[in-house]
């Protein structure tokens, strides 16, 4: 491989490839499509790469850790992982995120219902073993007109309580640790937030019969996102290596809208947003979309996205073919099957899954290993540990898998 040039936020340095790299060096090396000492791992470095609360609490019990669990996202019930857990897993990434507003918070209507800061109502939905998620119960813009958008009580993107003290915290983390940092400004969704506020069926109908409303709503969300993201990146942009954004654009079988519709409506919005982001930070752009988005990857690259997550293998299929087709232009982040192997497979099955994804996606860098989306409550602790241990076992460069 030879010596590698390491770039982080515009600063270059060289290091000997025979030495063990720091997590930050390791991640940035694969983002440069070069081979580090080993494949980096992300578990807990973001809102789509963590563990759902019940599964996380079982993992902590298995590890003998009794700390209080902190919730990252109420709807998806994702946990902030303790530092001790992340060190045991060997995660190379840490999250730098905006804080909850001190002026505006979700409102509990009763023990089973709440409204979020956008005015969307959610209702508790139980499933096995007493676990629950929150299902969309009411969309506040379901019957709105374009004129109504101007009168709607939007969250205030200039609310600086969301970043109070964040610059100092991010600098301390950057200077005193060697992890790769993923920035998440909190407001970063367009399509998902739009249809959540409008209702999915109505929004899909609007794509055909009411483009004026769709355009007006997306423009409003762009305005809010830019206004909120600016202060966040002013605070942390120099310290992060990755900036996370995303929208679920597909199901397991195909896109939620035609590629033409995406290119006409959403792509220009994202281009404006990401142009703004890149004016504030040198961090690489991480884009999360579940489902089969193969037909849009070229479009994502065109607007500056260089990281694709979660690499939903149950939808995308042959990961070796994905690497051949897109691997020179994007870094794949995720890829370990959360839908079938992690919940239902044995430790040996998990190890085989990790080995396969590293074999397919790891050559020449461009791969950060991790689960496909958040690890769910039905994944046994031994399989989470098997995932982490297998990445270290099989991920050493030069790869031999």
PLM features: residue spans?
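Short acidic, Pro/Gly- and aromatic-enriched capping/linker segments at domain boundaries
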Residues: 98-113
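Segments that shape or occlude catalytic/ligand-binding pockets
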Residues: 52-97
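Active-site loop segments of alpha/beta catalytic cores
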Residues: 2, 7, 15-60, 65-69, ...
